[in-house]
A protein has these predicted regions:
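A conserved beta-strand/loop capping segment in the N-terminal third of enzymes
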Residues: 46-49, 53-101
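N-terminal Rossmann-fold NAD(P) dinucleotide-binding loop
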Residues: 13-14
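C-terminal helical "tail/cap" subdomain of flavin- and related membrane-associated enzymes
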Residues: 298-347
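Predominantly flavin-linked oxidoreductase catalytic cores and closely associated redox partners
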Residues: 9, 105-237, 275
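A short alpha-helix-loop-beta-strand transition element characteristic
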Residues: 35-37, 54-72, 164-167, 182, ...
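Beta1/beta-strand and adjacent pyrophosphate-binding region of the FAD-binding site
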Residues: 1-10
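Glycine-rich FAD pyrophosphate-binding loop
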Residues: 7, 21-41
């Protein structure tokens, strides 16, 4: 029996696995995609994320960097016509390579890693959870805890809550070409005509990346054409046809969708737990939540012991309380800047 089975090999799952494996716990990570896996993400690491990653995994290897590898921060172009700078040095990385590095470090520490294998079902029992895996490594295994780190539409959350998640769809394309924007910034746009949620443009190696977040998936292509036209007209974008595109789902943050850390022996972390900062910054909250879960388990049970679930959940919730409050404060700040997000002032 495993101490913990983790669904998803993103930042939340990998940091949990690394910390617990280092401490002698038996951990399995199941990732439905082959690795390295493509993941739609800005790949911008704020200083908080850099600090947590390097404390847990060691120096971030240059192989995961994109150019310009130093990012100066965010320029937020609001729906009121103002531009609000959020300055702060960040690292610009390829998310696929970052995740591959962290999951390999977790495996080297002793975690069992199954790629191309997904959690298809689970059954909670009195002292453990039976987990059904499907894919490359099909099996039925037992664990004292199941941790869902597989996103707002992931299997763990969907089965636990018995309903579809409430989420934002993201769509971004990668182009060759030129644009009159400072490549050292991540540019975000809140104008209503460009998206009913947000839009963005950034540079990574030889690519200009253009994306939108939308309330309804069917609107993604329509709004994406609008941001492309806007960039051509206002920033002299001269872009090739897209080399490739990516879609993803993110939790819709709001009073109706509070942070949700799971129930019973089923725990949630990262965006599966509705932890996400404005402008789709979710790596830091994923790392913090995975770290908090690992530390909570280490405080409540030794390797091979069954934890007191009530105490474990209490420790996990308390450890995240300041992070959740800070996250909500950031959304309230956005609500004060942008009428589009004004309802989030109720958080």
């Amino acid at each position: 029996m495993y101490d913990v089975i983790i669904s998803g090999a993103g930042p939340a799952g990998c940091i949990t696995a690394k910390l617990l494996a280092d401490a002698g716990y038996s951990v399995l990570i199941a990732e439905k995609m082959p690795v390295p896996r493509n993941k739609s993400c800005s790949g911008i690491l704020i200083q908080k994320s850099v600090g947590i990653l390097e404390h847990t995994f060691g120096k971030i290897p240059h192989a995961v960097y994109a150019e310009p590898h130093l990012n100066k921060g965010l320029l937020l172009h609001t729906d009121t016509g103002t531009t609000v700078p959020f300055d702060g040095l960040c690292l610009n990385v390829w998310r696929s390579l970052l995740d591959y590095w962290t999951v390999m470090e977790a495996a080297d520490a002793g975690a069992v890693f199954f790629s191309e294998t997904s959690v298809r079902g689970f059954l909670e029992k009195e002292d453990h959870v039976t987990v059904r895996l499907d894919g490359k490594c099909t099996s039925e295994l037992s664990a004292r805890i199941l941790l869902g780190c597989d996103g707002p539409a992931g299997t763990v959350r969907s089965i636990l809550r018995k309903k579809p998640g409430d989420y934002i769809t993201t769509f971004q394309t990668y182009h060759h070409g030129d644009i009159d924007l400072d490549p050292a910034y991540f540019h975000a746009y809140l104008q209503l005509e460009l998206s009913d949620y947000d839009a963005w443009c950034s540079v990574k190696d030889d690519y200009v990346i253009v994306g939108v977040g939308v309330q309804h998936a069917l609107d993604a292509n329509r709004y994406h054409k609008k941001i492309l036209s806007f960039l051509a007209e206002n920033h002299h974008a001269r872009l090739s046809a897209p080399e490739f595109s990516e879609r993803w789902l993110l939790p819709r943050i709001g009073p109706e969708n509070p942070v949700d850390l799971g129930d019973g022996r089923i725990f949630l972390a990262g965006d599966a737990a509705h932890m996400l900062n404005p402008m789709e910054e979710g790596i830091s909250t994923a790392l913090v939540s995975g770290n908090a879960f690992a530390e909570a388990l280490m405080r409540t049970a030794a390797p091979g012991e069954n934890p007191d679930i009530s105490r474990l959940r209490s420790c996990y919730t308390f450890s995240l309380s300041s992070t959740v409050e800070h996250m909500y404060q950031l959304w309230k700040l956005l609500a004060g800047i942008s009428p589009k997000f004004s309802r989030l002032g109720e958080l």
